[in-house]
Regions:
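Noncatalytic alpha-helical scaffold of FAD-dependent oxidoreductases
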Residues: 1-242
Length: 242
């Protein structure tokens, strides 16, 4: 489908409003599904809520990811299927934002919402599903909107070509305050981390080198710094400039 144009200024304004809405904010962007999951967390004195996890979705998604290795047309429907398997359906009519559970004002009233109260380690740690290749870059917070618009345009170009790169899901976008740690990607500046992942279902290889190289080249245009624990090609001469 044709995509609604994104404008850098409006994207940045939405990001700034979103980040200010809770103590911890990240979102998971599924480009092929044209969907975004907003994940917001704040400290609370509420009691823990029971969590419900699907035993069917993880192995089914893994099998679909494996199948998507065999044809360039498959990652998009697999991404949409995975999103449907892991998210509740939107309400038939918009909800009253004052009745939203959890105390956080919803970003939208016509989308699905879920609320969880638990200890921090249980909230922030999650199952990565299967082995994966991953890369992540940290860009200055004020460049977030421009970087996301550029990534979207790049992925559109890739998807339009039969031999273009196909990205798995989701792209994780998270935010960190500036710190004073010399080797930290957030040293001296408020930061947006943008991370890509390519899954290896059943430990089978998957294409990732060219995709990651193009992503790195794009992030360098926004003064990006690599996450040390993930795939990157920045060596000493470049690191000295960061």
């Amino acid at each position: 489908p044709a995509l609604i144009p994104w404008h850098v200024a409006s994207v940045q304004a939405h990001i700034e409003s979103l980040v200010a809405s809770a103590e911890h904010v990240r979102f998971l962007w599924s480009p092929h599904a044209h969907m975004i999951t907003v994940d917001r967390a704040s400290r609370t004195d509420e009691r823990r809520t029971p969590t419900q996890t699907s035993r069917i979705a993880p192995p089914l998604i893994k099998a679909l990811l494996f199948a998507s290795r065999f044809h360039a047309s498959l990652p998009a429907p697999v991404s949409r299927a995975a999103f449907a398997l892991t998210h509740a359906r939107a309400p038939p009519v918009p909800r009253n934002e004052l009745d939203t559970p959890g105390g956080l004002r919803p970003v939208r009233t016509d989308t699905a919402i879920s609320v969880r109260v638990d200890d921090a380690p249980r909230v922030f740690n999650f199952d990565c599903l299967c082995e994966q290749y991953t890369t992540e870059y940290a860009v200055p917070f004020e460049y977030t909107g421009a970087a996301l618009v550029a990534i979207r345009a790049w992925l559109q170009e890739e998807h339009a070509r039969p031999d273009g790169e196909r990205i798995h899901f989701p792209i994780e976008v998270r935010f960190v305050d500036a710190d004073g740690i010399w080797l930290s990607p957030s040293y001296g500046r408020r930061t947006c981390y943008i991370g890509l992942v390519q899954y290896r279902p059943y430990r089978w290889p998957v294409r990732y080198r060219r995709l990651f190289a193009r992503f790195e080249a794009l992030m360098r245009q926004f003064d990006g710094r690599p996450h040390w624990a993930k795939t990157h090609t920045a060596y000493r001469p470049e690191l000295l400039t960061l």
